[in-house]
């Protein structure tokens, strides 16, 4: 009788974890439409359709690719710790009952669904850097290639059993995607925008954000989904997921306040766009360490990530001369690097036994692993993006739109649609 009761209790706990993870998966999915709104509100109205489309189409390519071969390449067994084999192609052999790992609290298929949402949002982040000047067909091909060449190998190296960069490798900590999601996409965005070159009227035109309420709504949806992003990375409903939930909220809140302070110092007034961007920066900063650092450390991470990203946006872009249109690198790349390093400063075995103690506890090894993991991620992202660009040029030809199309706007020239058809004339 006691064995039957124990078995029933275990089944209830497993069912609870499955429900929790499916909800978190749905929350992470919501981040992609949220990103479409966030980016769409930031551009001029002649590029709204194109900008939002560059996020939405990835829902299609991302899911189909993930089911066919993406999950297998990312998480199937491997002998090299770099890329999975094809044993799970088409999700063949992905169990509905057995866990991904021996100790997993959820079935392999549930884990697959959760990770699928990460594979959608990550390449979508890149598109903000090239808004308004890249041909849609070229971006379509580039994103497919980037997922294959950069994302799937990185996901395997950091999160899969035996991965080169993760706990079975050099020991770099990445709870929910500092390396895999934000640094990879942010650095790739930087490389791609440098290759494309600046917009034709860059530094000469006054780029007006066309819809601030849409930006705020998009940022809010991103934060809402981010709770599933970070808390769900605990992979079960337990104290660690609650801890990740709280560090996520605290870092975002602190980052909002510090960005507002930066606005006041520089421009004498706080801005709604600034507060929204600060929210996203704080979320990026806490992502690698959400399940590894104390809650008080999340305050420090949020407070410092905003100024670092703010400096890159306000001074770094001009100093280094790159046109990161919607600050994909400045927020995600810069914030991801900063957050990854601070994870090596504040990580604590008292929070998560998988983590080593950070610099603040007098130990250097974890910080060194974080720095090495970031450097390797940078190399993979840069090299992979250059390869993807070269292949895209071969497949589609010139990837940048003509000056005429850029001036007219990509909504009409690439899609034959207008976000606001009742308005006449061009956006200046």
Map each language-model feature to its residues.
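Glycine- and aromatic-enriched membrane alpha-helices
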Residues: 10, 14-428
């Amino acid at each position: 009788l006691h064995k039957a009761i124990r078995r029933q209790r275990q089944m209830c706990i497993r069912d609870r974890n499955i429900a929790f993870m499916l909800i978190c998966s749905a929350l992470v999915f919501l981040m992609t439409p949220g990103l479409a709104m966030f980016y769409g509100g930031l551009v001029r109205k002649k590029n709204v359709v194109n900008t939002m489309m560059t996020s939405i189409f990835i829902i299609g390519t991302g899911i189909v690719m993930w089911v066919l071969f993406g999950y297998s390449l990312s998480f199937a067994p491997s002998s090299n710790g770099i890329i999975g084999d094809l044993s799970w192609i088409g999700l063949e052999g992905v169990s509905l009952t057995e866990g991904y790992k021996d100790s997993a609290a959820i079935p392999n298929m549930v884990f697959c669904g959760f990770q699928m949402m990460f594979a959608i949002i990550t390449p979508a982040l890149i598109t903000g850097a090239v808004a308004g000047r890249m041909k849609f067909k070229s971006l379509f091909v580039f994103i497919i290639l980037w997922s294959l060449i950069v994302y799937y190998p990185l996901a395997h190296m950091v999160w899969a059993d035996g991965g080169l960069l993760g706990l079975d490798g050099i020991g770099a900590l990445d709870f929910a995607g500092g390396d895999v999601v934000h640094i990879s996409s942010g650095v790739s965005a930087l490389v791609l925008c440098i290759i494309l070159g600046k917009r034709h009227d860059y530094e000469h035109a006054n780029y007006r954000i066309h819809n601030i309420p849409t930006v705020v709504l998009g940022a809010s949806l991103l934060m809402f989904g981010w709770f599933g992003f970070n808390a769900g990375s605990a992979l079960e409903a337990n104290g660690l997921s609650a801890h990740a939930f709280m560090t996520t909220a605290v870092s975002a809140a602190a980052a909002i306040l510090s960005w507002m302070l930066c606005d006041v110092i520089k421009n004498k007034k706080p801005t709604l766009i600034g507060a929204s961007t600060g929210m996203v920066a704080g979320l990026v900063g806490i992502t690698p360490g959400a399940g590894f650092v104390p809650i008080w450390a999340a305050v420090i991470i949020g407070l410092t990530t905003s100024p670092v990203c703010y400096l890159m946006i306000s001074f770094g872009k001009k100093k280094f001369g790159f046109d990161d249109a919607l600050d994909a690198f400045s927020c995600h790349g810069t914030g991801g690097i900063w957050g990854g390093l601070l994870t090596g400063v504040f990580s604590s075995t008292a929070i998560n036994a998988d983590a080593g103690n950070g610099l603040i506890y007098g130990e250097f090894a974890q910080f060194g692993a974080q720095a090495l993991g970031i450097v390797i991620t940078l190399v993979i992202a840069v090299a992979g993006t250059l390869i993807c660009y070269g292949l895209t040029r071969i497949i589609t030809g010139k990837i940048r739109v003509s000056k005429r199309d850029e001036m007219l706007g990509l909504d009409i020239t690439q899609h034959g649609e207008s976000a606001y058809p009742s308005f006449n004339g061009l956006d200046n």
